Each structure stands twice: as structure tokens, then as C-alpha cells.
Amino acid sequence: MWLLDQWAERHIAEAQAKGEFDNLAGSGEPLILDDDSHVPPELRAGYRLLKNAGCLPPELEQRREAIQLLDILKGIRHDDPQYQEVSRRLSLLELKLRQAGLSTDFLRGDYADKLLDKINDN
């Protein structure tokens, strides 16, 4: 690793001498860093790579999939055979989310809004 560090430092110094780092966007402004103090130091680089690649924890990935399935259901007629299949998949995901201790209220947003409107009207 020592040789690699030396090589990188040499290339950085050459780039600085050529002025390649001058006039970069955000120059002179403080960096906005994520608070990763809760992540063990040996895992921070891996977590940062996954975060920057758009990877999510399994529960949040399931939540995103549930929202996509809900959008699909809104576009399918109730008598369509695909409706039952998508509905079953959504129910399974909802169960998994609840078992993981996550709220599934986001799936019932329209119903809750209509119910509140009805209660407030009377």
C-alpha cells in the first residue's frame, strides 16, 4: 500500500502544479460530510460506497417496491387477472414490513385522507 500512496501523492502534486485543481466548483466552500459516527470505522468506506450507489437497506428497498406496486394497482382494473397477483405481492410486502417493525401507513394514505374528510364533514 505504501507504493500506491506514494504514486497517488505524486500525481496529486503534479496536478496541483499544473493548476488542474484551480477554479473547481465549490472551491473555498466547506465540504458537507455525512455523520457516520454511528458506523464502525472499518465499515465506513463500504457504507459510503453503497449509499453513493443508491443501495438501500432491505426494509427500505421493500418499502420502495411496495409504493411501486401500489402505483401499478392504481392503474389496473379490479377484474384484471394481474390485479390479484400484484395485490398478493403487495400484501406480502406489507406483512414483511410490519414484521420488521415498520409502519405501513404510507400504503393507506388515500383511504386515511378520505376517512378524515368524511369525519370532519359530519
Swiss-Prot record:
One Pfam family it belongs to: DJC28_CD
Source domain of life is: Bacteria
Query: What InterPro entries does the record tag this protein with?
Result: DnaJ_C_subfamily_28 (IPR052573), DnaJ_homolog_subfam-C_membr-28 (IPR018961)
> What NCBIfam families has UniProt attached to this entry?
PRK10203.1
Protein name per Swiss-Prot or TrEMBL? Uncharacterized protein YhdN
Q: What is the organism of origin for this protein?
A: Escherichia coli (strain K12)
Source organism lineage? Bacteria, Pseudomonadati, Pseudomonadota, Gammaproteobacteria, Enterobacterales
